[in-house]
């Protein structure tokens, strides 16, 4: 167990936001399928899995994204794999949405009595607990929070097998939204862009990792 803990912490220390990748080194198909699987298996609020992982390997499409993604100027042309993580919009994640009903029945395979109670609880949760029905943006931001769980798991899993990564929020939302909509990737308003992440192998070693002291970020009560 001690060895496993050491291996996990080694992966966390290995991981850094890689700004430029070696374009000659590619992540194997099996390794990348493993990374994607850790995203797919990630937890989400109410188990709704409000995400889609769009793997962008087409160089022309990457260049189109690059024009409006200031945070990935070096990553887009050099990463072995580049992923757009989409989050479901209010259209799909409001308590009475068809997506939720279908997900509960077909994916979670809930019995009818459980299903009805779950829908009722979801309405209560969204309406009164977290006040998520204030706007469509509030619901989308809630869904986007879930995608960051998958994002973190994918980057950690990648680090554990020696693959580098970089999370990217540095993009012009309106332009990226337009491009994805034109490509039909937002599925008639069911999705929108949440975050991006690049994977590959570092071209150079980073400077030593720095973090706040434990006593500055942890409080016991």
Swiss-Prot record:
An example Gene Ontology biological process: 2,4,6-trinitrotoluene catabolic process
Keywords: Flavoprotein, FMN, NAD, NADP, Oxidoreductase
CDD domains, per database record: NfsB-like
Highest rank taxon of the organism: Bacteria
Subunit record text: Monomer.
Main EC class the enzyme belongs to: oxidoreductase
Provenance organism: Bacillus subtilis (strain 168)
Protein family per UniProt: Belongs to the nitroreductase family.
Keyword Oxidoreductase (UniProt): yes
GO molecular function: oxidoreductase activity
GO cellular component: cytosol
The gene coding this protein: yfkO
Residues given in the record as NAD(+) binding sites: 157-162
Protein name (record): Putative NAD(P)H nitroreductase YfkO
Gene3D superfamilies assigned to the protein according to its UniProt record, in alphabetical order: NADH Oxidase (3.40.109.10)
Named cofactor requirement(s): FMN
Residues the record lists as binding FMN: 15-17, 73-75, 169-170, 211
PANTHER family per the UniProt record, alphabetical: NADPH NITROREDUCTASE, OXYGEN-INSENSITIVE NAD(P)H NITROREDUCTASE
Keyword NADP applies: yes
EC number: 1.-.-.-
